[in-house]
């Protein structure tokens, strides 16, 4: 330990420095996507919560005229100006195709200096498997980031004195790196973007598949699987980068006016502004609602124009008889049926084990049933609310739960920033150094957008970029509930009542008929659905290709059906099998994801009418090949986001 290489210096725990892990954190076997793990380290939790926020740099500018700011007063007035450009441009660099993955770099550094044990490989394989079975969303990214740090510290902190705690605060790692590694590009995947495909496979050209070309009788090829997948990855990362860059426009407006004061933004003035001094006047400027029509970067425009060819090369249908989504739907139906049978059998066992049924009431019977069917993933409900409350996904005014969660998040991030900014600023990566000065602070009103999948703040038609319902898919009880909820909407009326107008009555029925008792969450599910809003529910269940892809990607067997920590031997065997097989493939082909990313990008950067018409036609054909029925793509493109 005395001769550790300098490349690991940033991760070496200083003498007397606390890493935040509670006692017994590393004693139990690791179970991926376990809510209990989040309670092992409050410091890391708050660090990731801070990292989910963009950092704005404040400055004071003189007001030159009354036209600059309404009611600004005399010439001596000053305006607090806040800019996000510095932070956003630095963060967006993660999505450059030729930029090294920092998660891979950390893994390589640890491998070269310490070696990677079989036990570590088993834990890492478990995390990768869970990420592949999860919908790419804010909650999944937060969990992956926390548990990646956990398994690295579990295996290397005690023996080698290296920790990844504080690496996000110092920007040695970012949530964008986690998203890129585990969800967007998937550096550990082995399928070349198509389930069943090998990463080193040479793909036969689709248009001439089966034909012999030339005298030598060779097949025409579309290219190597890795090359074709890299083209898709470029499209997805370029779209994400462009959507993220729209945030840089939000910091261009003045936020506060101070009459006749000559003060630095640092020090007491920030506290006075936060406390609401009487001398300030807020500028009436709305920046987070329906966004302006942004201009699409030229390189992205070219990539989007070629999305169809990109998608064809990484689409499943041309290589298999059954589409990836059709198989996923069949597997989901089987799992739901098996779970219902299992739940019925356990309920029957509860009744049979009761010696005298007359001496216990229905609530006691229900308690025994829930004890047998306890869903450990229910703990993620609070995390979903903490991350999305107060954003367009769950507005504060929608429910008291959302209001309180947003308040707690803002207070937590604000306090953590004040307590740790100086510490982080001393060792922060050079690219982010300007964002850690006295004049900088997290943008609490913008919220944790850096952890969302699409990373823009535009809201439209009662919807926003991050879908609350997609985040709830990580919870087994809610995954099952949403399937039943959708069926109830479809079967609500035998007449031709629109699906949109069936949502509110079904929500009311779920609330009044006691479905909350069946879910065992005291009505939280219905409250969250109400918070999301009718439009967001409609978009998620019936309209949005991205939501459809996330639903298909969510693998209940991978997420919920595995040994737990009480079965040590079975759990160890399960993880060892994952690591030894080295078989990590997505449930949904990259062709469908290419469509989804193009669709979401066109919602923010609308194409010309001719290009839009061609896109809707081609997108409809791809969705039909995947047996996905959605309502009016052109409507969703223009009305929702």
From Swiss-Prot:
Family: Belongs to the herpesviridae UL32 protein family.
Region of interest called Zinc finger 1, as start-end residue ranges on this chain: 101-187
Function, as annotated: Plays a role in efficient localization of neo-synthesized capsids to nuclear replication compartments, thereby controlling cleavage and packaging of virus genomic DNA.
Organism superkingdom: Viruses
UniProt keyword terms in alphabetical order: Host cytoplasm, Host nucleus, Metal-binding, Zinc, Zinc-finger
Protein's UniProt keywords contain Zinc-finger: yes
InterPro entries listed in its UniProt record: Herpes_env (IPR002597)
Positions bound to Zn(2+) 2: 467, 470, 540, 547
Gene of this entry: MDV046
Species this chain originates from: Gallid herpesvirus 2 (strain Chicken/Md5/ATCC VR-987)
Location (main, coarse): host cell
Subcellular location(s) of the protein: Host cytoplasm; Host nucleus
Protein's recorded name: Packaging protein UL32 homolog
């Amino acid at each position: 330990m005395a001769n550790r290489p300098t490349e690991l210096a940033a991760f070496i725990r200083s003498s007397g420095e606390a890493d935040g892990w509670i006692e017994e954190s590393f004693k139990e076997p690791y179970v991926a996507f376990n809510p209990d793990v989040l309670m092992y380290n409050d410091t890391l939790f708050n660090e990731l919560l801070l990292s989910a926020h963009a950092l704005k740099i404040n400055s004071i500018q003189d007001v030159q005229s009354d036209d600059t700011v309404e009611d600004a007063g005399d010439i001596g007035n000053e305006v607090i100006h806040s800019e996000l450009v510095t932070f956003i441009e630095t963060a967006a660099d993660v999505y450059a195709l030729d930029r090294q993955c920092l998660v891979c770099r950390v893994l390589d550094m640890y491998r070269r200096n310490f070696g990677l044990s079989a036990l570590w490989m088993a834990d890492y394989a478990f995390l990768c498997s869970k990420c592949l079975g999860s919908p790419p969303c804010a909650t999944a990214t937060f969990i992956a980031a926390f548990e990646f740090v956990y398994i690295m510290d579990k295996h290397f902190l005690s023996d080698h004195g290296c920790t990844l705690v504080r690496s996000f605060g110092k920007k040695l790692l970012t949530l964008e790196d986690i998203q890129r590694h585990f969800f967007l590009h998937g550096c550990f995947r082995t399928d070349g973007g198509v389930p069943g495909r090998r990463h080193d496979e040479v793909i036969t050209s689709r248009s001439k598949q089966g034909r012999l070309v030339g005298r030598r009788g060779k097949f025409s090829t579309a290219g190597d699987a890795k090359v074709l997948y890299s083209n898709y990855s470029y499209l997805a990362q370029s779209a994400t980068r462009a959507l993220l860059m729209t945030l840089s426009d939000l910091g261009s407006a003045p936020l506060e006016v101070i009459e006749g004061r000559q003060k630095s933004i640092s020090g007491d003035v920030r506290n006075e502004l936060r406390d609401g001094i009487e001398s300030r006047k807020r500028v009436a400027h709305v920046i987070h609602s329906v966004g302006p029509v942004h201009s699409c970067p030229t390189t992205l425009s070219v990539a989007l124009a070629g999305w169809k060819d990109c998608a064809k090369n990484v689409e499943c249908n041309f290589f298999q008889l059954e589409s990836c989504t059709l198989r996923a739907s069949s597997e989901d139906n089987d799992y739901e049926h098996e779970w219902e049978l299992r739940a019925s059998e356990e309920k029957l066992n509860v009744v049979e084990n009761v010696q005298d049924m007359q001496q216990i009431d229905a609530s006691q019977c229900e308690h025994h049933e829930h004890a047998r069917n306890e869903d450990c993933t229910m703990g993620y409900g609070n995390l979903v609310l903490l991350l999305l409350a107060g954003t367009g996904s769950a507005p504060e005014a929608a429910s008291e739960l959302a209001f309180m969660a947003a308040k707690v998040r803002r207070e937590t991030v604000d306090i953590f920033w004040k307590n740790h900014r100086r510490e982080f600023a001393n060792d922060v990566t050079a690219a982010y150094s300007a964002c850690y000065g006295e004049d900088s602070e997290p943008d609490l009103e913008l919220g944790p957008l850096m952890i969302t999948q699409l990373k823009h703040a535009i809201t439209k038609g009662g919807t926003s970029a991050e879908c609350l319902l997609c985040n709830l898919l990580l919870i087994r009880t809610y995954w099952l509930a949403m399937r039943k909820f959708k069926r109830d909407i479809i079967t609500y009326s035998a007449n031709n009542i629109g699906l949109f107008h069936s949502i509110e009555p079904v929500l009311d029925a779920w609330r009044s008929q006691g479905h909350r008792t069946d879910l065992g969450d005291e009505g939280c599910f219905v409250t969250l659905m109400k918070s999301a809003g009718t439009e967001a529910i409609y978009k998620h269940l019936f309209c949005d290709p991205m939501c459809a892809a996330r639903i298909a990607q969510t693998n209940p067997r991978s997420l919920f059906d595995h040994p737990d920590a009480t079965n040590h031997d079975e759990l160890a065997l399960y993880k060892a099998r994952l690591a030894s097989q080295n078989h990590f493939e997505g449930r949904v082909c990259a062709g469908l994801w290419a469509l989804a990313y193009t669709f979401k990008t066109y919602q923010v950067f609308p194409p010309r009418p001719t290009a839009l018409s061609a896109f809707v036609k081609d997108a409809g054909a791809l969705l039909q090949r995947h047996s996905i029925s959605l309502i009016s793509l052109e409507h969703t493109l223009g009305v929702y986001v």
